[in-house]
Amino acid sequence: MRLHRAKVSKSVFTLSTLTASCLMAFNSYAAVDCSALAEWQSDTIYTGGDQVQYNGSAYQANYWTQNNDPEQFSGDYAQWKLLDACTTDGGDDNQAPNATLTSPSASDVLTTGDVVTLAASASDNDGTIARVDFLVDGVVVAQASSAPYSATWTAVAGTHQISAIAYDDKALASTASQVSVSVTDSTQPGNEAPTVDITLSASQVDVGDVVTLTANAADADGSVDKVDFYVAGSLVGTVASTPYTLDYTTTRSGRWLCLRARLITSARQRIRPRRRLTVAAGPWSVPVVLMVCIKPKGQCAVLYGVREDGREKMGADHPRRVIGYFTSWRAGDDDQTAYLVKDIPWEQLTHINYAFVSIGSDGKVNVGDVNDANNAAVGKEWDGVEIDPTLGFKGHFGALATYKQKYGVKTLISIGGWAETGGHFDNDGNRVADGGFYTMTTNADGSINQQGIETFADSAVEMMRKYRFDGLDIDLRISNIDGGTGNPDDTAFSESRRAYLMNSYHELMRVLREKLDVASAQDGVHYMLTIAAPSSAYLLRGMETMAVTQYLDYVNIMSYDLHGAWNDHVGHNAALYDTGKDSELAQWNVYGTAQYGGIGYLNTDWAFHYFRGSMPAGRINIGVPYYTRGWQGVTGGDNGLWGARLAKSKRVSNRYGEGEKNNCGYGATGLDNMWHDVNAAGDEMGAGSNPMWHAKNLEHGIWGSYLAVYGLDPTTAPLVGTYARNYDSVAIAPWLWNAEKKVFLSTEDKQSIDVKADYVIDKEIGGIMFWELAGDYNCYVLDANGQRTSIDSTEQACESGQGEYHMGNTMTKAIYDKFKAATPYGNTVATGAVPSETVDIAVSIGGFKVGDQNYPINPKVTFTNNTGVDIPGGTAFQFDIPVSAPDNAKDQSGGGLSVIASGHTRADNIGGLDGTMHRVAFSLPAWKTLPAGDTYELDMVYYLPISGPANYSVNINGVDYAFKFEQPDLPLADLSSGNGGGTGGGDTGGGTTEPGDVVEWVPGSTQVSDGTTVTYNGKCFVAQNSPGVWESPTQTNWFWEEVTCP
């Protein structure tokens, strides 16, 4: 972690009486006697508590540090803490400043909820005032860095000590100036509480309809001054006399818009009952997913499958999700290859995704000829598979609709997939490359295909309703601004549209969410929208900040296929953690490049933290594979792991695209590739792809009775050598190694599943998704004829040669058993306290570059001031970014953006990332006000992908405010009184910001120190790393950082 004296806003917390007294006792400070302190040495290791002197000041180490200059790396969360200036003779010529608290006074009459002005005068005879701290009961509640020194505090009942302490430019503190004030409880005995309730003329309306809000307000021992009406945290009207009635015209949609009345009486009491109103979606709205209806007396309504706490209802034994993909193509009549709806372990699942539905040539969802009696989706029937005859359709859809009613499991249609993102299969099984998602969402000129999206979305919702599904799962592979990341067969459609695909993807998801919410309101159910998302940083870098998460119920991370035969790096298919040994990352010097912070990004833990930047943990599900990936002819490595196998030709197939332009690997074939794809010529594509039940048979040396059906026989594909199981206890990943054949198969089994399930529980993650149900295994006892009979849960029959593995539910049951008694999943994005009020500041993120130009990642974050008042220069903003990126985020706009609280400080992420979020901060230039209605553009830079950011706040006049768009149900602050502003601002950083301080650069002549801002050829730059007189600035590099000119 590298911090440069960034300021951190401090939240109010409760201290014990002893602690508060101790704090107040140290109300003035003397310089430190440094005679016994050693000078700081750059090559010395210091640990927490060590004290040193440096450049006339005393510092104390906060934690382990080496080669971190105490002057540059001091602060609340940095390596060093500044103690004070040094004195070696017991004296100090610096005089303490003076502070006088001018407000409040002891005679003030204060009531709970009053906004109290804190004000002080301050002076320093031999220097300047750096800041004034305001304290309540010994706790700093606000700071002011310029005169007039003032802030506000919301009064709470009781007697409180209010104090002001001034600090001079040498960090010497004044004696505390303090006063004791009493705050009366507005509901104290002798003052009867007022009453108020809200009634609505309608509980469900359309956008544009008028709703009459009526407040029945009374005060038995006083009078009602007024009633304020709020909708979604915004004041919409005030009524000062009876009847307290307001006609409100709905302007936004959403389930459960919060309606609130604030009653203010002559005794200044305030009570705030709430009601909720459902407003059906309008053509432009962005509904909010999974909101909770809070009624008076704390009761909550339950609707659309949402619990009182906002979490999804899934049954008493399902606090976390267990989601399985059911594939359409295992629909034959042979028990050796078929996997039907009756085979699903229904009791152990919460959701089933049907894979796949495609996009037909007409732009609508497609499952083939629905009038064909052999259509697996809607026409076919199977012995032993129950289908309700009253449904009006058969096939997998009929069976899923029948069984889910018995078990309370939700079903979703998965649309897309690798082969059907850019095309579909016709009735003869031939792939038709007609553009699929690419042409449906994006026109040839890059514009959004609005009509195509409307047509598709309408057909998807219609299919969902007709066939009794609970939602849509979009499996788009892959809408991306990076090149070579999708199916190479789709290149003709994808490459020309690449720069525009994310815009179209956002619009597609927005329209789907809107149409699903309209259908939900009409049908009285909650229809879900989810996606299958990639997991590697290379792919996610091309998906900007994954802004589509705002429209989703949850995201399923495909945290598998992290290594495979698309390149020659022999590694784990689905590692949970990085080990610091990933050969692909090592080849690209990810571990050794400082900007990456040593973070390995080909693992589940990294992918989870990426999505955690924009979503609660409970709206994220990690993925696990019930299949293998593998190579043949592997050389080197630890039993093959991190070895290599280059393909016989540079391109043995085009199955996986260009990726990072690694060499193609030599994928395992034959017996080691039972679940293989074929290319256009019908040839087997080597990938080492097998269901886990076949891998378990290989592990135990069993020739499966099913192999002949898959075209394998012992004469042409003999069982050679031993498939020894290995386990990486750091990555949490098993694999099989056949030393004789040099075959490596990356696997998943119960041991790794158990650890991953524990990880989900510990991290408060929503659950686990797996591909696919038919890949799970059981051990079956074989009878005298070699037929599978009963299940042996001990697996002894398979270990002794008396059984074989086949399709089952061992891993699924392990997940269910772990989850059934788990705590509820996490349901908040924020990891800390949220401010109690909001301001209306909008945020948009854009300007991402295309392809390899998108490094470092450098978007423009635009803040729009919708507060109605000017925001003064120097105002400090903060927000969170996930620890998927290292703690070296910065900006190129002079805002001094830096990480002020790091969630992960280690030089690697071996065994997992430590925290959840980094807190970053920047300030408006001190000389530049942000006018009402205007924007500020933050030119942000970071080095690994993030989703979000999230948890925005702004500090105005010493008070932290959340942003309205993130916290719509919190009250909106009133900044119109002129109390707004700027006193809570932090370091502007990034060099000088006053126009007069900018130095004109003259090559060969100008000599500057680090931090100086210069102008050259019409651009401005901040010096760093001591540039010489001939190091003329032309772009951001080792010596210069380009910034916006003041």
From Swiss-Prot:
The stated induction of this gene product is: By (GlcNAc)2.
Q: What is its EC number?
A: 3.2.1.202
Q: Which GO terms describe its cellular component?
A: extracellular region; periplasmic space
Q: Which GO terms describe its molecular function?
A: carbohydrate binding; chitin binding; hydrolase activity, hydrolyzing O-glycosyl compounds
Q: Where in the cell is it found?
A: Periplasm
Main localization of the protein described in the UniProt heading: periplasm
Which Gene3D superfamilies does the UniProt entry name for this protein? 3.10.50.10, Carbohydrate-binding module superfamily 5/12, Glycosidases, Immunoglobulins
Means of activity regulation:
Inhibited by (GlcNAc)4, (GlcNAc)5, (GlcNAc)6, and PNP-(GlcNAc)3.
Q: In which pathway does it act?
A: Glycan degradation; chitin degradation
Q: Where is the composition biased (Gly residues)?
A: 978-993
Domain GH18: where? 320-801
**InterPro entries found in the cross-reference section:** CBM5/12, CBM_sf_5/12, Chi_C, Chitinase_II/V-like_cat, Chitinase_insertion_sf, Glyco_hydro18_cat, Glycoside_hydrolase_SF, Glycosyl_Hydrlase_18
Q: What domain of life?
A: Bacteria
Activity at various pH: Optimum pH is 6.5-7.0.
* One Pfam entry name: Glyco_hydro_18
Q: Which family does it belong to?
A: Belongs to the glycosyl hydrolase 18 family.
In UniProt terms, what function does this protein have?
Answer: Hydrolyzes chitin oligosaccharides; (GlcNAc)4 to (GlcNAc)2 and (GlcNAc)5,6 to (GlcNAc)2 and (GlcNAc)3. Inactive towards chitin, glucosamine oligosaccharides, glycoproteins and glycopeptides containing (GlcNAc)2.
Identification of the protein by name: Chitodextrinase
Write down the species.
Answer: Vibrio furnissii
Q: What is the lineage of its organism?
A: Bacteria, Pseudomonadati, Pseudomonadota, Gammaproteobacteria, Vibrionales
